[in-house]
């Protein structure tokens, strides 16, 4: 089952998907984990689909198969490290009866340690505008747990055309990082009608802003535990937005109130988040 979820019934609204998953498993059925067991028990794939490559992260070797990397042959206490990129995740989703909540429950059954989990929300309707977000930040109309952010404006040297717009909250090593960027510019498909149609972009009003939430270590594991819990009734997008709501909001200035946290939330942000609830990442164990 695809995790690409339409958050509203209309076309060109918002889509939410898991876009990265990294985890480490040390034992399977009481014995040291092996790459073969990761393939058969966790991924449920065939050995023949993988080729051997040089390792990384302290592992001597890795097995690779189109967006899926299994790092092995490290120190005895390192276990096996599984890394699934966005392309690999789309591959797994295309399998019959596949779901990420079941995948994660199975991984937790083998005492997996989730080390990174990325969630992407694609706004193809026009709720988020990169120039508006930058203007809000410049005017101090952003309330956040993050102390700083950095903005990147990428241009083509040949003619000065804008080639990319990005805002980062947090660093690459932060346990929580947000990245908002113009996916249409990043993909370079703003004038390619065929590719826009393939990516479900409104040709008459092309818009594609991606909001990426990158979680690491405890935050990644806690989010995965929530999502894998059979008692959880929230869709992926609802969960992600509640986490975002706990870290970030854009507001409208009020000259009569110096407390920025009391300023009214900007309408565009209210429409994008679509919830007043917040999700604080505290642990709860899922049921098998």
Residue ranges and their predicted role:
Residues 1-286:
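Structured, helix-rich domain cores that form ligand/interaction pockets
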């Amino acid at each position: 089952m695809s995790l690409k979820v339409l958050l509203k019934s209309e076309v060109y609204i918002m889509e939410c998907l898991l876009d990265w998953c990294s985890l480490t498993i040390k034992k399977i059925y009481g014995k040291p984990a092996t790459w073969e067991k990761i393939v058969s028990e966790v991924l449920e794939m065939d050995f023949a689909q993988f080729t051997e490559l040089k390792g990384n992260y302290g592992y001597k070797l890795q097995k690779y198969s189109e967006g899926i990397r299994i790092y092995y042959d490290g120190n005895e206490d390192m276990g096996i490290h599984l890394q699934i990129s966005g392309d690999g995740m789309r591959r797994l989703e295309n399998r019959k009866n596949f779901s990420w909540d079941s995948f994660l429950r199975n991984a937790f059954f083998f005492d997996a340690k989730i080390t990174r989990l990325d969630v992407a929300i694609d706004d193809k309707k026009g709720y988020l505008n990169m120039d508006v977000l930058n203007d809000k930040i410049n005017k101090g109309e952003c309330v956040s747990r993050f102390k700083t952010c950095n903005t990147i404006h990428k241009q083509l040297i040949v003619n000065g055309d804008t080639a990319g717009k990005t805002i980062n909250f947090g660093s690459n090593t932060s346990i929580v990082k947000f990245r908002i960027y113009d996916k249409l510019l990043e993909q370079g498909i703003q004038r390619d009608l065929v590719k826009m149609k393939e990516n479900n972009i409104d040709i008459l009003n092309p818009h594609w802003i991606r909001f990426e939430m990158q979680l690491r270590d405890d935050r990644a594991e806690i989010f995965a535990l929530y999502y894998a819990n059979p008692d959880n009734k929230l869709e992926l997008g609802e969960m992600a937005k509640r986490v975002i709501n706990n870290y970030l909001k854009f507001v409208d200035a009020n000259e009569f109130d110096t407390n920025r946290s009391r300023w009214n939330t900007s309408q565009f942000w209210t429409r994008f988040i679509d919830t007043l609830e917040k999700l604080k990442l505290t642990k709860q164990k899922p049921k098998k």
